[in-house]
Amino acid sequence: MWPFASVPAGAKCRLVETLPENMDFRSDHLTTFECFNEIITLAKKYIYIASFCCNPLSTTRGALIFDKLKEASEKGIKIIVLLDERGKRNLGELQSHCPDINFITVNIDKKNNVGLLLGCFWVSDDERCYVGNASFTGGSIHTIKTLGVYSDYPPLATDLRRRFDTFKAFNSAKNSWLNLCSAACCLPVSTAYHIKNPIGGVFFTDSPEHLLGYSRDLDTDVVIDKLKSAKTSIDIEHLAIVPTTRVDGNSYYWPDIYNSIIEAAINRGVKIRLLVGNWDKNDVYSMATARSLDALCVQNDLSVKVFTIQNNTKLLIVDDEYVHITSANFDGTHYQNHGFVSFNSIDKQLVSEAKKIFERDWVSSHSKSLKI
């Protein structure tokens, strides 16, 4: 019926947030707990979840979500949780707690063993989906600031489910030739919507390059293109910006995003605001990078602030016309090696709502000047 139905603006997407209880503001948007709860409650056939790791029992709200998943699985709803091979620390406990949930570990880069499953998304019944930076952990559901998008528009959910099929093909328990055959089957039909064919002003982008499939957009290409074409403003809220790629303990310079930010500020006079995280999960290069941007662009309209509470929000807004929400840092290792899906939109309402979130965070008491 989709070809004959009008496409709703923004593909029925709503912003979703987790805000820790110790923050000095609240959100008007759906909470991550409410989003996951709704997906589970409305599911009739299946729920597919992709996350680097799975540790929902670490907080009360996370445990409630996992208990609801357990109840759904006991009613016959098919539940599959994809985890990265290196993120399965709590797998035994979860399997014993709920044997009806199918946990599958994946290795998206068996050849070099450097890539991780970094994507955070849920899909149910080809009807509802979530994509953002909330992994399936108690912290992301309750105590760590995150941002994502929920939609109950079936065409968009179906398109995200194709990504799940791709990642699932890299089941670490299977032989390599089975992985390759499975991937070959799912990649040619990997997407219906992309930068040249968004649906309701919405499309997904993907990483890494070897998982793109037919007509998918490489996330790096889209992000850099938007940064390079920025005319008036760039707002970035990220855990980290790291212009390096790490392989086997060695670091290599990867300046693509870093240079695009500097060029926008110095060459084109674009107003840039950068809000970075500052907690123990930060790369050691993160604060050095923030300080270098601040110093290099001291004569330009570039401002840097540090968010003092655990903040895993990863948000980019360009010219108040485009929004990008992802699970990856602006980090060479993430963009060159890891598997993830990002949300993109040019829908005016969605961009406006994301902008309000950035403005709220930027002026909050939790945002401190880098110079303090």
Swiss-Prot record:
Palmitoylated. Attachment of the palmitate moiety is essential for correct intracellular targeting and protein function. SUPFAM superfamilies: Phospholipase D/nuclease. The keyword RNA-binding does not apply. It catalyses: a 1,2-diacyl-sn-glycero-3-phosphocholine + H2O = a 1,2-diacyl-sn-glycero-3-phosphate + choline + H(+). Keywords: Host endoplasmic reticulum, Host Golgi apparatus, Host membrane, Host-virus interaction, Hydrolase, Late protein, Lipoprotein, Membrane, Palmitate, Viral budding, Viral budding via the host ESCRT complexes, Viral envelope protein, Viral release from host cell, Virion. GO terms for cellular component: host cell endoplasmic reticulum membrane; host cell Golgi apparatus; membrane; viral envelope; viral membrane; virion membrane. A lipid is attached at C185, C186 (S-palmitoyl cysteine). It is a lipid-anchor. A motif (YPPL) lies at residues 153-156. Gene3D superfamilies: Endonuclease Chain A. Major envelope protein that plays a role in the biogenesis of the viral double membrane and in egress of virus from the host cell. Produces the wrapped form of virus that is required for cell-to-cell spread. Acts as a lipase with broad specificity including phospholipase C, phospholipase A, and triacylglycerol lipase activities. This is Envelope phospholipase OPG057. It comes from Vaccinia virus (strain Western Reserve) (VACV).
